[in-house]
Amino acid sequence: MDIDVGPVDPSVLYEQDLHVSSAVWEGQERGLLRCQEHTSLLHQWKLTDEQINLVDKAGFGYFRKIGPMSLNNSLISALVERWRRETNTFHLPLGEMTITLDEVALVLGLEIDGDPIVGSKVGDEVAMDMCGRLLGKLPSAANKEVNCSRVKLNWLKRTFSECPEDASFDVVKCHTRAYLLYLIGSTIFATTDGDKVSVKYLPLFEDFDQAGRYAWGAAALACLYRALGNASLKSQSNICGCLTLLQCWSYFHLDIGRPEKSEACFPLALLWKGKGSRSKTDLSEYRRELDDLDPSKITWCPYERFENLIPPHIKAKLILGRSKTTLVCFEKIELHFPDRCLRQFGKRQPIPLKVKRRDRKNRRLDDLDTSMSLACEEWAERGDHIVDSPGGGNVVDDGAYMEWYARISITKLYREAFLESQVMNMIACMREFEEAASGIALERLSPAEREVMESVKDTFANSLTFGGWQEVAVNSGYGKRRRRNEHTPTPNNGGGNDISSLLLQKEDS
């Protein structure tokens, strides 16, 4: 059964045929995504005071405090179904929302202002040279500790997790670089490889003071945007990137699957480290809850109450959350569109400007170099592109915006409820036809026409009375003419052998 769920206007969500929602509507469930963030062993690293000081200099002083975080795979999988890489936003019933730069700073404590993280891929020979020079030890290719310039996270932990008490400062720096490489490889730069991290990041920690001048938060968001975009394709079964950020973002904004809060402290991800982070709710239930989101379930500006916890140097950069700019992390280039989600800043949401289509095929090296150069130029001008509502204003439901949004988006994914509604609308049409047929004077028809009409009437009458649908149709008003796409409630007659359930079973078979 082909179901056209939209969008009515495909000019924005032009990749609908690739998106997982198209598979969901066809009943092709891919199941839960495999979440590739590996924080469970972070606590096994024993850092000395010297190492902690170097980690602070490198810009990860707050981030390292978060440590292991239990992930709710069902919730994450449901959120990914709402992500659209055409706009880098979640498409929810009340409009678009996204993870913005300021939220990276608040939730993770990472720097969102500074130099972009750029570089190029390295070969195996260069990677081994980097390990020898910056780590002081070499992984073994024979033992599969290194492959394609990527080292195993387990090798880093096994070799460097405890720095000798009598270590020289050079050895301390090597162990600290190994920890930082492990930290980013298991969190913000985690990949679908799962247990490996690229050595290309290692030179970023050669000078710890310089490392502290990078915009790690912007790079983390670029990687998460890319990971969400990839995972939103129906062909994918994994998701990587900083899933702690994704999950905490949801807890702050959406009253769905939230655990009990811990004591508030900075970074704000620590608020959600208490017991109960895992949930037994399945994907289909989260899908339904996201379909049913109403204003009471959304907190547009959740961080205002924590203002007294935010360090001054972090607070001074939060304005960049409203920067319409380009995020960079090595070869990854992603667009940051706060203008599509101004209600998250307490602003009125107008209809946003059209997003230019991205050509994701046949990316040549020279095209990538040109794009990277332009992206870095845009990032350098990030402070000049702070967006605001036309005329300012408070959060309001803008009728023009919601009317536009209804045309360009897809906000309902709970397929079972939609199909039941379609079945009930079909029954309403059958009821109308039966009533119309009953008003026809059969004596005016020829014998052959009369026989056909009586057969049709009997067929509709028998169908409607099967399972009690005649009474349901009358009492629920299903005989009334309805506008197209008008919501129809689903009756509950306590029986399992009715037309609706049989048709749904047939559709699922």
Swiss-Prot record:
The keyword Ribosomal protein does not apply. The keyword Lipoprotein does not apply. Expressed in root tips, the shoot apical meristem (SAM), leaves, mature flowers and embryos. GO terms for biological process: meristem maintenance; regulation of root meristem growth. GO terms for cellular component: nucleus. Residues 477-509 are annotated as: Disordered. InterPro entries: AminoTfrase-like_pln_mobile, MAIN-like. Keywords: Aminotransferase, Developmental protein, Growth regulation, Nucleus, Transferase. Disruption phenotype: Strong developmental phenotypes, such as extremely short, and agravitropic primary roots, small aerial organ size, altered shape and pale white leaves, bushy inflorescence and reduced number of seeds. GO terms for molecular function: transaminase activity. Residues 488-503 have a biased composition (Polar residues). It is found in: Nucleus. PANTHER family: PROTEIN MAIN-LIKE 1 (PTHR46033:SF35), PROTEIN MAIN-LIKE 2 (PTHR46033). Acts as an important factor for cell fate determination and maintenance throughout plant development. Required for the organization of the root apical meristem (RAM) and the shoot apical meristem (SAM). Required to maintain genome stability and cell division activity in meristematic cells. This is Protein MAIN-LIKE 1. It comes from Arabidopsis thaliana (Mouse-ear cress).
